[in-house]
C-alpha cells in the first residue's frame, strides 16, 4: 500500500513548495520549446497534485499517471481532475518501457515514496536512454536513515546499517569511497545523490556510444525536505551537447535561487506561521538579506519571530502554501 493512505499529498507544505519551484523551473522550457506539446509522466496516486499544477500553469495536455496498486484503480480514475490524464496500471518498471518517450519531449517525475532500490536504477535506465533532448527527468525518494535499520533481506535476524545500504543500492553500484563511511544523515544523502547521478551519466555515456547525436544530462535540482520523513529530489535536463549552454541561458535556469548543479542540497524548510504573520511579512517582502543574516528592513528585524524563521520564509514566500477550510 502506498503512502497516499497515510498522508494527504495536498497538505504537505514542503512538498507543495517543491512542486511550485519545479513548476517555475519548467516554465523556462517555453523559451526554447512549445510546452503544450510535452507529455508529463508521474505517479499521481489519488491526489494528482503535480498533474493539476503542471496542466494549469504549463499548459501540458498529455499526461500519464502510473499506478501499481490495483485496489485503488477505480478511485484513481474517479479522482482524475482532467480528461487529458491517462491512468496506466502497473509497476513503473513495466509501464515506462512501453511509453514512446523517444517520440516526443517529456517531463518525467518519478516521485517514489520508498527508499532507493533496483526499481529506481531500472527506471533511470529506461527514461534516460529513451527521452528526447530538451526533456526533463527527476526522481524523489525516501532518504531517511531509518531505512538502514531494517533487517537484512538475506538474514532477517540481523540489523546492520552498513550492510543494509549496500544491499539496497547493490554491491556493484556501491562506490568504494563510501564503504568505510559511517552512514550519518548527511553522508547518506551524499551517497544517494552520487549513485543517482552516476547511474544517469553512465546511461548517457552508453547512449552516446550508440548514437551520432551526443547528449548530456545537466543537473538542476537537488532538494531535501521533511514532511514527516526526509525526502531527496534529484533531477535535471537532457540536452544535445551543442545546445546545453544556449538553452540553459534562454531558460534562465541558473538564475533561480534553488538551482543546484552539485551535491550541495537546497533545503526546503517551511516555517509554521499564522495567517496574520504571513500577511505582515508579505507586506515587507522581498527584501535584501545581508551576508551576516540581517534583513534590510527595520520592521522585519524587529518582528516577533527569530531571524532564522523570517529568513526561511523570505526564501520561499512566493511558493508558500495557503490552506483554507471551507464548507461546501
Indicate residue ranges for each PLM-predicted region:
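SAM cofactor-binding core of SAM-dependent methyltransferases
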Residues: 2, 6-100, 251, 268-272, ...
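Class I S-adenosyl-L-methionine
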Residues: 3-8, 97, 115-328
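A generic "functional-site adjacency" signal
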Residues: 16, 102-106, 190, 230
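Sequence-level motif detector for i,i+2 pairs with an aromatic at +2
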Residues: 35-38, 103, 134, 231
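N-terminal start-of-chain detector that recognizes signal peptides
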Residues: 35-38, 111, 206-210
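Long alpha-helical, hydrophobic tracts
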Residues: 47, 64-154
Amino acid at each position: 500500500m502506498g503512502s497516499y493512505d497515510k498522508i494527504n499529498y495536498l497538505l504537505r507544505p514542503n512538498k507543495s513548495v517543491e512542486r511550485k519551484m519545479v513548476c517555475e523551473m519548467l516554465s523556462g522550457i517555453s523559451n526554447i520549446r512549445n510546452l503544450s506539446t510535452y507529455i508529463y509522466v508521474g505517479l499521481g496516486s489519488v491526489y494528482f497534485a503535480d498533474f493539476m499544477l503542471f496542466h494549469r500553469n504549463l499548459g501540458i495536455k498529455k499526461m500519464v499517471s502510473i499506478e501499481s496498486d490495483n485496489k485503488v484503480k477505480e478511485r484513481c480514475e474517479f479522482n482524475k481532475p482532467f480528461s487529458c490524464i491517462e491512468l496506466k496500471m502497473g509497476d513503473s518498471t513495466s509501464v515506462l518501457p512501453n511509453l514512446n518517450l523517444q517520440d516526443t519531449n517529456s517531463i518525467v517525475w518519478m516521485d517514489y515514496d520508498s527508499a532507493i532500490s533496483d526499481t529506481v536504477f531500472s527506471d533511470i535506465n529506461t527514461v534516460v536512454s529513451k527521452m528526447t533532448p530538451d526533456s526533463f527527468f527527476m526522481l524523489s525518494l525516501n532518504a531517511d536513515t531509518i531505512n538502514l535499520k531494517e533487517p537484512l533481506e538475506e538474514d532477517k535476524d540481523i540489523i546492520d546499517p552498513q550492510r543494509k545500504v549496500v544491499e539496497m543500492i547493490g554491491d556493484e553500484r556501491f562506490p568504494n569511497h563510501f564503504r568505510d563511511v559511517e552512514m550519518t544523515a548527511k553522508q547518506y544523502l551524499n551517497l544517494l545523490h552520487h549513485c543517482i547521478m552516476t547511474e544517469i551519466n553512465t546511461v548517457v555515456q552508453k547512449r552516446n556510444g550508440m548514437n551520432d547525436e551526443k547528449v548530456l544530462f545537466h543537473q538542476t535540482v537537488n532538494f531535501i525536505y521533511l514532511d514527516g520523513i526526509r525526502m531527496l529530489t534529484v533531477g535535471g535536463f537532457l540536452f544535445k551537447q551543442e545546445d546545453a549552454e544556449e538553452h540553459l541561458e534562454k531558460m534562465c535556469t541558473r538564475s533561480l535561487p534553488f538551482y543546484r548543479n552539485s551535491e550541495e542540497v537546497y533545503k526546503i524548510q517551511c516555517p509554521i506561521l499564522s495567517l496574520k504573520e504571513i500577511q505582515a511579512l508579505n507586506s515587507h517582502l522581498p527584501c535584501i538579506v545581508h551576508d551576516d543574516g540581517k534583513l534590510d528592513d527595520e520592521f522585519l528585524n524587529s518582528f516577533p519571530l527569530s531571524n532564522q524563521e523570517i529568513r526561511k520564509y523570505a526564501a520561499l514566500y512566493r511558493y508558500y502554501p495557503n490552506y483554507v477550510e471551507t464548507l461546501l
